[in-house]
Design a protein with these regions (language model features):
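A short macromolecule-binding patch
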Residues: 11-24
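Catalytic nucleophile-His microenvironment captured as a short glycine-rich beta-strand/loop
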Residues: 1-12
């Protein structure tokens, strides 16, 4: 069982000073539990990402995706790690490739393969995966992070817009930022997402 704290009130039944026990088998909780495990140190100078929306959907049948970034912060940055998010899938084999000096912003693999790392996730969630060797990226150049998942039935997380009585979230993707590989070619997410 979990020892839980009710942060809303200490005046509910079956609790002691706002704490109560909740069985793992209690049907009042959903089928997923979230635990956050953070690194204690700030290991990276910059974080390149395209932030999402308030809700995530699954793109089934697509195993490869990519993001293209432009190095802007320093004369010569080092890419040391890549994050991937698999909100509901565990034990997923992956291969991550980093390409530098891109020659075509519509093709994430159009540059030089600078790093490749493979592994398997052990739990669902967001993973920070360290590269075997840091990749040097000069200021102003474009680089791509390509992620390939090797487990059938796994869906890629993709944020989408939400609007209801308590929350409104708008999602927008610009061109030449994020890509999906399907039907034998790269497809820009800006053409897939709603604007």
């Amino acid at each position: 069982a979990w020892l839980c704290r009710n942060s809303w009130s200490d005046k509910t039944e079956n609790n002691i000073n706002s704490y109560f026990w909740l069985s793992y088998y209690d049907k009042s909780i959903e089928d997923a539990a979230w635990i956050f495990d953070f690194e204690s140190a700030d290991n990276y100078d910059y974080n390149y990402q395209y932030d999402g929306g308030a809700d995530v959907g699954k793109l089934r049948g697509i195993s490869t995706s990519a993001n293209i970034f432009r190095a802007k912060k320093a004369d010569n940055e080092l890419v040391k790690a890549v994050s991937i998010s698999l909100s509901k899938d565990a034990n997923v084999p992956y291969t991550i490739r980093v390409y530098t000096n891109l020659t075509n912003l519509h093709k994430p693999k159009s540059g030089i393969l600078a790093a490749k790392v493979s592994g398997t996730t052990t739990y669902a969630g967001t993973h920070t995966i360290r590269l075997n060797k840091a990749v040097s990226v000069p200021q102003g150049t474009y680089y791509a992070v390509v992620v390939e998942l090797q487990k059938s039935g796994v869906g890629l997380d993709m944020e989408y817009a939400v609007s209801d009585s308590s929350l409104t979230s708008r999602v927008y993707c610009d061109y030449n930022q994020s890509f999906l590989y399907r039907y034998g070619s790269w497809e820009d997410v800006a053409d897939v997402s709603t604007r």
